[in-house]
């Protein structure tokens, strides 16, 4: 559950509560079951890095910094509070919250948001590795894979941190996939390049294969790329409307023949011209 619509749910207050915007827990369970009957898996978007700073939630829970750090790393760039992974009770809380969606609601996997902000202090490699976060994520994935080995566990991570998708038995963090943010940026940059300049930009289409086998990647054209004035995917492309339609078909063909799993934000395959508004996202 989350109080601020504009956060899209990423400023969480209730880690064990499905948002009431769509109904009650029984409604969500019915939704998952209906998806399964149609052969559709359900992957939850989980936020184990930071939480809403609201006074009626986890922040200063008992009058002290119980869940968050008591230092300059206690707050994120979004004004939220960062979880303190050096407290066992905090790690236990997050482990239990993640397990709830798999155990009670029978979801098929978990996508974990903003993992780069956990691996490094404040997401900044120059500040060093947050060893507490690494240990927490490794233990979380190990536990999830032991109890639900067929689940899909994915990291949104834009860093060069090694072994994010390596098994925990090989000292990896244990995710099944990580988002290939580099592929996404390079590909969209290439297709936004004027036609006459593209011969000098081919490296943007080939560079991803130079590092692709370092991790198990998922190619994502996500919600983050079609909001806040970034334009929809088709509107990012160079040319007239007819040329953009042809290029979009080419972009998707390239995406689906490129190694790696695939993810498209809802509506992108329908050639939406305008960005989804907050009210459409809620509806």
Model-inferred region functions:
Residues 271-283:
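Single conserved hydrophobic/aromatic residue that forms the stacking wall/gate
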Residues 32, 141, 277:
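Catalytic Tyr-X3-Lys helix of short-chain dehydrogenase/reductase
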Residues 1-107, 111-129:
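Substrate-binding/active-site clefts of carbohydrate-active enzymes
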Residues 59-61, 170-172, 283:
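Glycine-rich, phosphate-binding/catalytic loops in enzymes
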Residues 13-16, 234-237, 278:
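Glycine- and acidic
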Residues 14, 82, 178, 218-220, ...:
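Generic structural signal for residues positioned in beta-strands
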Residues 106-108, 120-271:
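Conserved alpha/beta catalytic core and glycan-binding cleft of carbohydrate-active enzymes
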């Amino acid at each position: 559950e989350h109080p601020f619509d504009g956060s899209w749910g990423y400023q969480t207050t209730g880690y064990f509560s499905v948002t009431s915007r769509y109904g009650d827990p029984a409604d969500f369970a019915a939704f998952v079951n209906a998806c399964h009957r149609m052969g559709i898996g359900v992957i939850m978007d989980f936020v184990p890095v930071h939480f809403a700073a609201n006074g009626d939630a986890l922040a200063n829970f008992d009058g002290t910094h119980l869940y968050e750090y008591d230092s300059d790393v206690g707050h994120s760039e979004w004004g939220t509070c960062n979880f303190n992974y050096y407290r066992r009770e905090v790690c236990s809380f997050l482990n239990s919250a993640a397990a709830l969606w798999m155990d009670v609601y029978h979801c098929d996997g978990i996508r974990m948001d903003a993992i780069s902000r956990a691996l490094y202090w404040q997401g900044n490699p120059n500040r060093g590795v947050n060893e507490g976060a690494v240990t927490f994520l490794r233990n979380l994935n190990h536990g999830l894979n032991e109890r639900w080995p067929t689940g899909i566990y994915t990291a949104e991570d834009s860093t060069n941190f090694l072994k994010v998708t390596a098994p925990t038995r090989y000292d990896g963090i244990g995710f099944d996939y990580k988002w290939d943010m580099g592929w996404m940026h390079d590909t969209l940059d290439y297709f936004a390049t004027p036609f006459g300049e593209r011969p000098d930009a081919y490296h943007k289409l080939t560079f991803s294969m130079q590092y692709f086998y370092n991790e198990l990647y998922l190619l994502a054209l996500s919600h983050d790329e079609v909001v806040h004035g970034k334009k929809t995917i088709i509107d990012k492309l160079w040319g007239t409307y007819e040329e953009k339609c042809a290029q979009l078909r080419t972009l998707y063909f390239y995406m689906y023949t490129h190694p790696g799993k695939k993810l498209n934000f809802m509506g992108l395959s329908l050639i939406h011209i305008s960005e989804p508004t907050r009210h459409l996202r809620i509806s």
